[in-house]
Swiss-Prot record:
Known function: Binds 16S rRNA, required for the assembly of 30S particles and may also be responsible for determining the conformation of the 16S rRNA at the A site.
Gene: rpsN
GO molecular function, one term: rRNA binding
Organism (species): Gluconobacter oxydans (strain 621H)
InterPro entries assigned to the protein according to its UniProt record, in alphabetical order: Ribosomal_uS14, Ribosomal_uS14_bac/plastid, Ribosomal_uS14_CS
PANTHER family registered for this protein in UniProt: 30S RIBOSOMAL PROTEIN S14, SMALL RIBOSOMAL SUBUNIT PROTEIN US14M
Keyword hit for Ribonucleoprotein: yes
GO cellular component, as recorded: cytoplasm; small ribosomal subunit
This protein's name: Small ribosomal subunit protein uS14
Keyword list, A-Z: Ribonucleoprotein, Ribosomal protein, RNA-binding, rRNA-binding
One biological process term in Gene Ontology: translation
NCBIfam families: PRK08881.1 (NF006477)
Length: 101
């Protein structure tokens, strides 16, 4: 089990990303638009720099929904390899069977 504070911190970051997504993408589009003046693009760069860092999508870590484990996660299931193995062996994941040959 991961520390509760680490999981809560990550959840808070995800909420900030969701909240600031439109504003960030608008500023990034202004920065990339070569038809605008240099001053407008620079102002957009300064505004983007003033936004909180935790609002960036790269700051959010993919964590297991059950254990909060930050590594070895399957995106499709949003579970760590350990939790996925436990649930699959218990028959909790439909269609997943242990392979044998």
């Amino acid at each position: 089990m991961a520390k509760v504070s680490a999981v809560n911190r990550n959840n808070h970051r995800a909420a900030l990303v969701k909240r600031d997504k439109e504003k960030r993408t608008a500023l990034k589009n202004i920065i990339k638009d070569r038809t605008l003046s240099v001053e407008d693009r620079f102002d957009a760069t300064l505004k983007l720099a003033q936004m909180p860092r935790n609002g960036s999508a790269t700051r959010v870590r993919l964590r297991c929904k059950l254990s909060g484990r930050p590594r070895a996660n399957y995106r499709k299931f949003e579970l760590s390899r350990i939790a996925l193995r436990d649930l699959a062996s218990a028959g909790q994941i439909p269609g997943m069977v242990k392979s044998s040959w």
